[in-house]
Amino acid sequence: MGQCRSANAEDAQEFSDVERAIETLIKNFHQYSVEGGKETLTPSELRDLVTQQLPHLMPSNCGLEEKIANLGSCNDSKLEFRSFWELIGEAAKSVKLERPVRGH
């Protein structure tokens, strides 16, 4: 895949809703990835992110809790952004819209 441009304050006005959502996911990932490198989350960081940022999706989505359990409690275990993205995809599958959104 190609390189993405870096988001800054000037570009934010041009972003679509989906682009802003992706940017928010990236920022949240980096905000919580403090113990190791900025490119990975430890099990405790992932648990903090999920419980604080996905409180309504977490109880209904076993995939997230299972992934945390699979990482174990050892903070030597790391979750890369790609795996985090897959978890977000699994969480999104549990979201049901009340009615379809049209015109976007």
From Swiss-Prot:
Tissue specificity annotation: Expressed at highest levels in colon and at moderate levels in thymus, kidney, liver, small intestine, and lung. Low expression in heart and no expression is seen in brain, skeletal muscle, spleen, placenta and peripheral blood leukocytes.
Keyword terms, alphabetized: Apoptosis, Cytoplasm
UniProt key word Isomerase: no
GO (cellular component) term, any one: extracellular space
CDD domains cross-referenced by the UniProt entry: S-100A13 (cd05022)
Domain EF-hand: 27-61
Single Gene Ontology MF annotation: calcium ion binding
InterPro entries registered for this protein in UniProt: EF-hand-dom_pair (IPR011992), S100_Ca-bd_sub (IPR013787)
Main localization (coarse): cytoplasm
Subcellular location: Cytoplasm
Keyword Cytoplasm among record annotations: yes
Biological process, per Gene Ontology: apoptotic process; calcium ion homeostasis; defense response to bacterium; positive regulation of granulocyte chemotaxis; positive regulation of monocyte chemotaxis; response to lipopolysaccharide; toll-like receptor 4 signaling pathway
Complexes and interactors: Homodimer. Interacts with AGER.
UniProt function note: Modulates P53/TP53 protein levels, and thereby plays a role in the regulation of cell survival and apoptosis. Depending on the context, it can promote cell proliferation or apoptosis. Plays a role in the regulation of cell migration by modulating the levels of MMP2, a matrix protease that is under transcriptional control of P53/TP53. Does not bind calcium.
PANTHER family: PROTEIN S100-A14, S100 CALCIUM-BINDING PROTEIN
Annotated protein name in UniProt: Protein S100-A14
Organism of this sequence: Homo sapiens (Human)
